[in-house]
Amino acid sequence: MALQFTLNQDAPASAAVDCIVVGVFADKTLSPAAQALDSASQGRLTALVARGDVASKTGSTTLLHDLPGVTAPRVLVVGLGEAGKFGVAPYLKAVGDATRALKTGAVGTALLTLTELTVKARDAAWNIRQAVTVSDHAAYRYTATLGKKKVDETGLTTLAIAGDDARALAVGVATAEGVEFARELGNLPPNYCTPAYLADTAAAFAGKFRGAEAEILDEAQMEALGMGSLLSVARGSANRPRLIVLKWNGGGDARPYVLVGKGITFDTGGVNLKTQGGIEEMKYDMCGGANVIGTFVATVKAELPINLVVVVPAVENAIDGNAYRPSDVITSMSGKTIEVGNTDAEGRLILCDALTYAERFNPEALVDVATLTGACMVALGHQTAGLMSKHDDLANELLAAGEHVFDRAWRLPLWDEYQGLLDSTFADVYNIGGRWGGAITAGCFLSRFTENQRWAHLDIAGVASDEGKRGMATGRPVGLLTQWLLDRAA
């Protein structure tokens, strides 16, 4: 964890921490904790705000030192923007801004009082849970492969959260741990995070907790199951594939929820080789797998009273003389044959076998998560995942969960009129659908392997990682999925 978290009910003026975090609205109205500090300092905070020494616009932070009558040597004032517009997004931004302001420097411990604020259509427990997940996300530092590069070890280590709801704190910490677990896997370079490494890491986590278990299928076992589609993608790589199966048994005899995550640990594109200007980011093509593993971590840590199964086909799409080719016809585990139109449309080829495998668990609901198409990113950008399902109830559950935690998805159609774009002369289905509607035709392809399931597909190509040299894995949609499971456990 990037941070350690505690609950704190001390009066702000007497809290024994390095820094107190309070807020101020654009109209110069102080948050309740800020009012308490203002009273303790005999109006000092009000005076500083009035003369413009403390900014109140959204995104601003002002660090004050030695406020009279306040035990903490520092007070961080966070701008909250207009009071009438204050809601979910401004609250989450304020928490993140505060954490980033204290990420480096002399402050080791802080008390976050922003949880006392009223957020429209949310309760105090939500405030605490989201404060934990957002602040841990903001404080995250990647260090796994830095070698001799110096890491700034100063800054915030412990964040006390104003409030008394221990369960809300525990769920927030569990979710944050799941997000961070997923981000760490996603950020690792592909020479580290191979299919075997991903499998070993997931199994090692499951082995630490009663009620959790892992099964790792190797190439021979997958071949015996008839997973010809998945294994075709794996043929060109020296890093052999694994099928990761994780189980959390928290719900007695109830049917499990099943998450399937695309785990392409690096995607060259295969024979249809990717070009420079994007291939260097293809280590993130396993983020669907990383994020369903992260959701498993959150579920186990929160001890949710449900049954959960996670399935991750972990494969590297590489090139050698044995690599699969465009125009190959391969046979999936379902028995359906697939004509390969493009070897860079490999995610759906590993997912179709994993989805077929998942049927054996008799899922209450089946959701796959994948960085599946650039087309989804073109359509929706980096702000939202794409959601496809023929089951309105399931789609609405996922959409509501995403809205609740601001890890949102947007529903795209999955109409039968698109299915004809996948017709093949030489096989049951073609693995690409042409230039138009690429995200939707990818979803249509997967729908052919989930016909008897209550199923939804999340295309996370736009939200799984930040772009550019300094970009990192985001851990999305661990928040959405964890909230969805929390709702099912309620």
UniProtKB/Swiss-Prot annotation:
InterPro entries the UniProt entry points to: Leucine_aapep/pepB, Macro_dom-like, Peptidase_M17_C, Peptidase_M17_leu_NH2_pept, Peptidase_M17_N
Binding-site residues, Mn(2+) 2: K262, D267, D285, E346
Enzyme Commission numbers on file: 3.4.11.1, 3.4.11.10
Organism: Xanthomonas axonopodis pv. citri (strain 306)
Disulfides per UniProt: none
Name of the protein this chain belongs to: Probable cytosol aminopeptidase
Catalytic activity as recorded in UniProt: Release of an N-terminal amino acid, Xaa-|-Yaa-, in which Xaa is preferably Leu, but may be other amino acids including Pro although not Arg or Lys, and Yaa may be Pro. Amino acid amides and methyl esters are also readily hydrolyzed, but rates on arylamides are exceedingly low; Release of an N-terminal amino acid, preferentially leucine, but not glutamic or aspartic acids
Residues annotated as the enzyme's active site: K274, R348
Amino acids binding Mn(2+) 1: D267, D344, E346
Cofactor note: Binds 2 manganese ions per subunit.
